Amino acid sequence: MNQMNPAFVMPDVQSTVDTRQIPIQRVGVKAVRHPLTVCTESGDVQPTVGVWNLDVRLPADQKGTHMSRFVALLEENRAPLTVERFRAMLASMLEKLEAEAGRIEVTFPYFVNKTAPVSGVQSLLDYEVTLAGESRNGDTRLFLKVLVPVTSLCPCSKKISQYGAHNQRSHVTIDAELAADLPVEALIRIAEEEASCELWGLLKRPDEKFVTERAYENPKFVEDLVRDVAQRLDADERVAAYVLEAENFESIHNHSAYALIERDKRQAA
């Protein structure tokens, strides 16, 4: 077995000068799976698994970044994730990598315990959540994105049919830039309350009757859905800007209906 000479200094190739003089806007690690815990609206802690993307800006004269430091950052941050801890984590990454700009993004399944509307039976429903932060020239922006599955029912189908109406599962995706702390549950509630009906993991027959009739009494086109959710986001001071999408997986077509609204509330409409 070869023994390393204790006097030998391993070269740091990444820190050498690059003569091509081309800056790299984003360089780092992608799709790193790592356990994390998140704080819920009620103050409980929920264990989950995050898929992380971490990157920084690399100056034109620097050959490479220090890839191991990204993973080391995850190992050092095992405390339950909050918006403030996430902000501090972003600042720590820039310090460790000696970078002027960088971005962290983590996507994870988030579970909410829901109570069925009639029977009261409880079950979990999962939502896809992404927390992202980017820092540049001392300015830090944080984003909270959640994909909410809901039910939509077609107003036209209801109007022209003697009975019944076609309905389907839909996805409402809210990507909000935060002006203040905003619980994941708050965005979930907005999407579910503005849909024809929300979803549950477990329903009994009386519950199925309720959700069927609830959707029938609250029909919405995909245009109605995004506009109603947008009104709620416009009224929420915790949201500075947003990209809002709705996709209906049409039950009578082999394609989806889709709508998008994008707004920065800091700018005049």
From Swiss-Prot:
The protein's annotated pathway: Cofactor biosynthesis; 7,8-dihydroneopterin triphosphate biosynthesis; 7,8-dihydroneopterin triphosphate from GTP: step 1/1
Catalytic activity: GTP + H2O = 7,8-dihydroneopterin 3'-triphosphate + formate + H(+)
Top EC class of this enzyme: hydrolase
Source species: Burkholderia lata (strain ATCC 17760 / DSM 23089 / LMG 22485 / NCIMB 9086 / R18194 / 383)
Tagged with keyword Hydrolase: yes
Keyword Magnesium: no
HAMAP family in UniProt: GTP_cyclohydrol_B (MF_01527_B)
Role played: Converts GTP to 7,8-dihydroneopterin triphosphate.
Family according to the record: Belongs to the GTP cyclohydrolase IV family.
An annotated GO BP: tetrahydrofolate biosynthetic process
UniProt cross-references to PANTHER family, sorted A to Z: GTP CYCLOHYDROLASE MPTA
One GO MF term attached to the UniProt entry: GTP cyclohydrolase I activity
Protein name per UniProt: GTP cyclohydrolase FolE2 2
Annotated site, May be catalytically important, chain positions: C154
Disulfide bridges in this chain: none
InterPro entries noted in UniProt: GTP_cyclohydrolase_FolE2, GTP_cyclohydrolase_FolE2/MptA
NCBIfam families: PRK13674.1-1
Keywords, in A-Z order: Hydrolase
